């Protein structure tokens, strides 16, 4: 898992299966996670978030709050308040996915640099999620594990907010004060495309549908294009005509390479019979035969490759990208910089940002896919029109869910199920959208993690590890147990994933609390905060990875700006957990 060869969900599920076969755990232990109330709640809340997203509610509220301030710090502060408030009551991944194009458009309209807002956007979503028990999936996983051990344990809706709210306030102040000093202005991929149009190149193949086969370039209307020029023509036999004269005859199978601005590119891609091949240097070619439907309804997509994508460590050519996704790669950025050379030879890595020319259904198919950390329309400048009735209905139903859950009238899974049913019968959400929103990776991680956690208990491994941690942190006195769990969980989250970190660290936190003679709540809340407070790497938390491309960030940008915030989080979390949640038992 640490080396990234196999995903955390696969590792934990395989480990749980082996433990079951060896007789170390029972079948009920191996599958306890799938039947746990909190884990069912995660799946339901993900589907509810999809309903809020499809209705436009997630765009409506932040767009209203952001305003039109020309002062950067005002925009950052307003964004922090808006995003943290919404993230407190719903999963932060779909929220950030919706907010990225909203913030990009807002920055463009108000002359702000996106790199000063994208990382703060992720941090605001993370911090806001720490204010309630339903704010992040890791909170719900930890609650599920704790209540499985002690069904009488009460974890009120906003109790974790005793830590999360001060953290959120401190995070907002930190962003406003230190982003001008520590957060560099970076050129994003889309800014580079627009600012340097001569660098933007696309190649198309002439197929039988092109209406001007056998005619000259000039008579075909490809000579005096606005913001665009025909830089190269290559025949099927490999003969190349650089800067072809206007009298050159166009033949079926010709490869035409254009250079220019994005508006010109969109015009060329809209012509039936000109099928895109690739974009890069003039000699670059994916060396594959392309065929497809007319491109008039195709869109430009900005996408970030997830760490678990099946195309990771494969070249674009070997991944059969076009046939797999129905899309063509036009540009690839890594660590904030464009990868030059032939696109077909680029080895894909998790976190790469791609500009794609894709079919109109690409976003619908892959918006919630684990193959992509982010997929958004690259050139959407205005919010799509939404049905006002569906928007306010989705908000009203969701607010009712939050009120009922905060009053502890019904279990979260029950209120979430009622909310989801209301979304379905009112048409806010469809069954297919529900299926697409189910977080299979999280559920597999939890399903396997519950079994591994049980094995750590019955074998005594958790007890021994807890004793070792107590010895290492004994110099901190009463703060030792909480500091041990917070530090260990934060480290494990950076190496694995937050879901895996919670399931592996929970039995250690429980045994550590018993050995130290303190309440479970202190180490438990430290576990929740530690699993979600990875600010220093783009790969430690999903939303960090999502904003890395749109912000044009390099890896060390997260370390420079996020590591101090990581220490701030520790300095706030540990004392509060000790002073408020740890009376001696």
UniProtKB/Swiss-Prot annotation:
Pfam families: CitMHS, TrkA_C. It is a multi-pass membrane protein. The keyword Transmembrane helix applies. Belongs to the CitM (TC 2.A.11) transporter family. GO terms for molecular function: monoatomic cation transmembrane transporter activity. Coiled coil: none annotated. This is Putative sulfur deprivation response regulator. Keywords: Membrane, Repeat, Transmembrane, Transmembrane helix, Transport.
């Amino acid at each position: 898992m640490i080396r990234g060869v196999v995903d955390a969900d696969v590792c934990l599920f395989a480990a749980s299966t082996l433990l079951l076969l060896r007789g170390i755990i029972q079948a009920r232990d191996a599958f306890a996670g799938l039947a746990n109330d909190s884990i069912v709640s995660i799946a339901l809340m993900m589907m509810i978030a999809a309903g809020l997203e499809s209705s436009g509610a997630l765009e409506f509220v932040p767009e209203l709050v952001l305003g039109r301030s020309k002062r950067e710090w005002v925009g950052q502060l307003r964004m922090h308040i808006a995003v943290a408030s919404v993230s407190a009551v719903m999963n932060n991944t779909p929220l950030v996915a919706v907010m990225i194009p909203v913030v990009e458009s807002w920055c463009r309209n108000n002359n702000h640099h996106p790199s000063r807002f994208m990382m703060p956007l992720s941090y605001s979503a993370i911090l806001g999620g720490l204010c309630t028990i339903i704010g992040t999936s890791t909170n719900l996983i930890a609650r599920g594990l704790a209540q499985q051990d002690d069904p009488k344990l009460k974890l009120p809706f906003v109790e974790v907010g005793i830590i999360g709210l001060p953290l959120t306030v401190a995070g907002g102040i930190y962003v406003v004060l230190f982003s001008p000093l520590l957060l560099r202005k970076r050129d994003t991929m889309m800014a580079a495309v627009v600012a340097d149009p001569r660098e933007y190149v696309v190649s198309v193949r002439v197929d039988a549908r092109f209406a001007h086969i056998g005619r000259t370039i000039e008579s075909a209307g490809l000579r005096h294009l606005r913001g665009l020029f025909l830089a190269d023509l290559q025949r099927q036999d490999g003969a190349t005509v650089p800067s072809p004269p206007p009298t050159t005859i166009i033949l079926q199978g010709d490869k035409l390479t254009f250079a220019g601005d994005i508006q010109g590119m969109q015009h060329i891609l809209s012509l039936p019979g000109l099928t895109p091949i690739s974009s890069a240097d003039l000699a670059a070619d994916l060396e594959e035969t392309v065929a497809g439907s007319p491109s008039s309804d195709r869109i430009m997509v900005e996408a970030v490759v997830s760490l678990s994508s099946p195309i990771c460590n494969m070249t674009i050519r070997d991944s059969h990208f076009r046939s797999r996704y129905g899309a063509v790669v036009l540009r690839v950025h890594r660590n904030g910089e464009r990868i030059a050379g032939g696109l077909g030879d680029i080895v894909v890595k998790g976190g790469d940002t791609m500009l794609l020319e894709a079919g109109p259904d690409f976003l619908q198919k892959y918006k919630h896919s684990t193959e992509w950390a982010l997929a958004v329309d690259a050139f959407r400048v205005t919010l799509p029109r939404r049905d006002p009735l569906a928007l306010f209905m989705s908000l009203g139903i969701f607010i009712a869910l939050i009120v009922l859950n905060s009053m502890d009238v019904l279990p979260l899974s029950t209120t979430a199920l009622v909310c989801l049913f209301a979304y379905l019968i009112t048409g806010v959400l469809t069954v297919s959208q529900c299926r697409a929103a189910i977080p299979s990776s999280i559920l597999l991680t939890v399903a396997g993690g519950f079994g591994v956690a049980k094995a750590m208990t019955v074998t005594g491994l958790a007890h021994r590890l807890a004793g070792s941690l107590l010895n290492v942190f004994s110099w901190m006195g009463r703060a030792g147990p909480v500091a041990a769990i917070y530090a260990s969980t934060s480290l494990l989250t950076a190496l694995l994933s937050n879901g895996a970190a919670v399931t592996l660290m929970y039995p250690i936190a429980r045994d550590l609390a018993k050995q130290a003679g303190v309440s479970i709540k202190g180490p438990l809340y430290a576990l929740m905060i530690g699993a979600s407070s990875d600010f220093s790497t783009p790969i430690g938390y999903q939303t960090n990875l999502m904003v890395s491309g749109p912000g044009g960030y390099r890896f060390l940008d997260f370390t420079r700006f996020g590591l101090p915030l990581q220490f701030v989080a520790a300095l706030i979390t540990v004392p509060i957990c000790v002073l408020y949640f740890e009376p001696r038992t």
